[in-house]
Design a protein with these regions (language model features):
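Bacterial N-terminal signal peptides that target proteins for export
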Residues: 2-11
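N-terminal leader/targeting pre-sequences
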Residues: 24-203
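Bacterial N-terminal signal peptides
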Residues: 10-20
Length: 203
């Protein structure tokens, strides 16, 4: 029975790799894959693309993100997320990506971006309330939860105004440092919700 289950799991992973040609694994263990345009940005940014390479480096991973086909000279916010589309689940702010005059941006992030990427809250504890004037104010207490694996990526406009300037919807979302970002632009919904690309990176 165990051998059968082990074989089935291996076959499932192999099938996933065959069916998703956007993911490639190199001899050095690095994994390369694409991000796709989010549903809310498909009409206004149909040519937006993202390309990600994650390279294991001992105790951490190095993640290089290249985005193109975006508005020029614009700031975007990059997150590791539980699922690629709404409601997104647990989300972890990584940093910003700024585009140049040609709508292209690149940033390198160093951290834990692999099958071991997770968040956990063993218990509730008071949290500082710093940003509390917007539509998504800080919570003053966290809910406890067991480990949640987070294997997807998402990119958001840094502000609703920037999104509207690009002809996109002006919805306000919490995905920036002040919790008043614009809509999601790119994500990894080309992978299953429970098998995001980070799951295929092994430290």
């Amino acid at each position: 029975m165990f051998k059968h289950l082990q074989f089935s799991a291996t076959a499932a992973v192999s099938l996933l790799l065959v069916l998703n040609p956007l993911l490639a694994t190199a001899k050095d263990g690095s994994v390369t894959f694409d991000m796709v345009v989010s549903g809310g940005a498909r009409a206004c940014l149909p040519n937006a693309t993202g390309h990600v390479t994650i390279t294991p480096a001992g105790p951490v991973e190095i993640m290089d993100v290249v985005v193109e086909g975006l508005p020029p000279n614009t700031e975007f916010d990059f997150f590791v997320i539980q699922v690629p589309k709404a409601p997104f689940g647990v989300s972890w702010y990584q940093g910003d990506i700024e585009t140049n005059a040609h709508g292209r941006g690149h940033e390198r992030f160093v951290g834990r971006f692999s099958i071991e990427t997770f968040a956990v809250a063993p218990g509730s504890a008071p949290a500082p309330v710093v940003f509390n004037n917007g539509p998504f104010p800080d919570a003053s207490l966290n809910p406890p939860f067991n480990p949640i694996q987070m294997y997807h990526l998402g990119l958001w406009f840094g502000s609703p105004q920037a999104a509207q300037a690009a002809g996109c919807p002006g919805n306000v979302t919490p995905f920036n440092g002040d919790h008043n970002a614009g809509i999601q632009v790119l994500n990894t919904s080309n992978f299953p919700d429970d098998f995001g690309p980070l799951r295929q990176v092994h430290p």
